[in-house]
Regions:
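Non-catalytic substrate-recognition and accessory regions of acyl/acetyltransferase enzymes
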Residues: 1-106, 111-175
Length: 175
């Protein structure tokens, strides 16, 4: 029996989404109940991390991105200096990894999937613009994960939003 291989593919409803379990019911439900409709409506793009073994494909992670904007007055000065009233941005709306992969601390699947999401944003920003990648951590426990992966907190009290300039991401991933 060979080791499984992994690939990231655009959302397709023909994968078995019901077996996905990241340990967070809201994220599991969003994938199975809302992702397809969101993609079809053009609200966001969803990408699946698929594990291929000898006999099947299994969804073991996903992320969703969508265009947004950041308003200068709502952004930290260190980010928004020199901006017009608002700038185009990309939001990482969802990022989830199956509980089976989260146990593999060596592979760091969460960070790998985040990197894939950032690479995807770089590609779409190169084609259509965007200055910033924004993520809203669902809880304070996720702030450290995103900070370890290059995102900066806004510094505003109680704000769980983090950001990374697209130019910073481009330099980090395409030196």
């Amino acid at each position: 029996m060979s080791d499984p291989t992994y690939r990231v593919v655009p959302f397709a409803a023909d994968f078995d989404l019901e077996s996905f379990d990241c340990g967070e019911a809201a994220y599991n439900d969003w994938l199975t109940l809302h992702a397809g409709a969101s993609v079809k409506a053009g609200v966001c793009a969803v990408y699946l991390l698929v594990e291929r073994s000898e006999d099947s494909d299994r969804v073991v992670g996903y992320f969703a991105i969508n265009p947004t904007q950041v308003v200068r007055e709502q952004a930290p000065a260190s980010l928004s200096r020199g901006w017009p009233l608002s700038v185009p941005a990309w939001k990482l709306g969802k990022l989830a990894v199956h509980v089976d992969l989260r146990a593999d601390k060596l592979a760091q699947w969460g960070s790998q999937l985040l990197r894939e999401a950032i690479e995807t944003v770089i590609r779409v920003a190169d084609a259509g613009g965007g200055k910033v990648i924004v993520v809203d951590a669902d809880n304070s426990g996720l702030l450290d994960f995103y900070a370890r992966n290059g995102f900066k907190a806004t510094g505003l009290d109680g704000d769980l939003s983090l950001y990374m300039k697209v130019s910073t991401a481009r330099k980090a991933f395409h030196p």
